[in-house]
């Protein structure tokens, strides 16, 4: 049975990427809430084919930042969470688990930014992940630097979303 909740819909609509963070550690309670939201994410055939690697060590974060082309948020983040796909898992599920963690982060006042790791083999080496496991992205997390975020939005205001008429097709693409 589904429970209706306008708050969930609002959370999805209001979620924003945060690229600059305060120099402040995420509390244990907040981190556990974020990780637990990942744990509760649905998955194909309930496989739960993931492991979450939490990286706080600055040297590790710097090494991980070299594995992608657009990793600047890693440098000010308190931590990153790397969702690792186990061999029997699916990328679809990894996207679901990442989005749930980002929504949970926002719910406790923690900002997040999804970051693609373009050099998967390098990322696996940095994190000690076996070759048959997936390591394609991380989520940089921290408490938002509100002043920096306001300035970034002023320089590049949100453009909103395309109307549904441009995005939705019924029964066939064309």
Q: Which residues make up each language-model segment?
A:
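Acidic, surface-exposed loops and disordered segments
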Residues: 1-174
């Amino acid at each position: 049975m589904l429970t209706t909740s306008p708050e969930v819909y609002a959370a999805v609509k209001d979620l924003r990427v945060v690229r600059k963070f305060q120099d402040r550690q995420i509390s244990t309670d907040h981190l556990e809430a974020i990780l637990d939201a990942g744990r509760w994410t649905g998955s194909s055939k309930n496989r739960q084919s993931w492991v979450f690697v939490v990286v706080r060590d600055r040297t590790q974060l710097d090494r991980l930042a070299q594995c992608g082309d657009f990793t600047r948020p890693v440098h000010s983040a308190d931590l990153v969470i790397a969702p690792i796909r186990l061999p029997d898992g699916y990328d679809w599920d990894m996207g679901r688990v990442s989005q749930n963690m980002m929504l949970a982060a926002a719910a406790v006042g923690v900002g997040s930014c999804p970051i693609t790791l373009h050099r998967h083999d390098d990322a696996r080496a940095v994190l000690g992940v076996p070759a048959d496991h997936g390591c394609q992205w991380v989520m940089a997390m921290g408490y938002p630097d509100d002043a920096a975020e306001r300035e970034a939005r002023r320089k590049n205001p949100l453009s909103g979303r395309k109307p549904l008429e441009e995005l939705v097709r019924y029964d066939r693409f064309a």
